[in-house]
Amino acid sequence: DHMVTGGLQVMDGSIDNQLDNHAHQSPGDVMKTIPNASAFYSQKINDDLYAGIGLYGNYGLGIDYGSWAGDRLIKKSTLVAMTLSPSLAYKLNDHLSIGASANVNYGYFSLTRNVNDNDYRQHDEDWAMSYRLGLLMQLTDQTRAGITWNSETNYRYSVNGKARVQNGAYDLPVSAQISAPQQIMLSLVHDINPRWSVMGDLGWQDWSQFGAPQIVVGDRQLNNVSRLKDTWHGAVGVQYRPTPQWRLNIGVAFDSSPYESQSDVALTLPTGDEWRFGTGAQYQITPASNIGIAVSYLHMQSSHVKSPTAFAGSYDHPYLWFASVNYSYQF
């Protein structure tokens, strides 16, 4: 009637930035290793009602440009979001269940720049609410379908200070507003036989309303939100159960680029079309406990930065990899 799950995750990769003006020093690989952790608890209230709570890292990105031509504008940046998610699920009948959660989100943003040949670090944090609704349908004995809606999450960060860029010195606010867009996800699982299952999902994200990281110098907004568009997600996977103790998974996913043009992306948000390839395994240690591991590789579309013009350049063939381990215990 009770279950606890704990997990550890790590993300790394290569995001290489090369300036168009080769007379200037390029940042090179700006990616930093990002560790993460998660914990979940669920409890059966009665035959139809379940309650749970989760604490997990929603997303994170650490970039380190080092000592480069634009280090007076940005040298290092870290963005982290953690979520506390209490939830309820209710079984309406043998074919239909509903679920909902109210998420308390904590966001942290830091920015380090070169000021008078010294690292000047500023940071800010914010709290935001978001919500999730879900519907699970048992279509047949072998087929299940679900739909999930996640609301938009708005973070607002404000960091004030002085920045000295190539064409002059300014007293300016450096600001960033990060919004995680609302999304809808459809999913389907079909058990072919006791050993094989196939699954897939299709999703949409409202990135056209997303606030891209903004750097404002005087009255000039260097990163323009109008460059963004909605995105689509698709994934397919297979699960194989060779024995009652083992579950083996493999899958591939695609996410379309949020940018209208890959030749005009934000300096601090290099992304594009993404292909992810993953595999994992779960082992039932005892009737009450299991352990799982997973690894995945993400290939990202190349992109080009137009503004600020002095630091125009390219992110060529970026990639990320992810690894995770989790343990669950029922009691």
Label the predicted regions.
Residues L19-S26, T33-F331:
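Outer-membrane beta-barrel porins/channels
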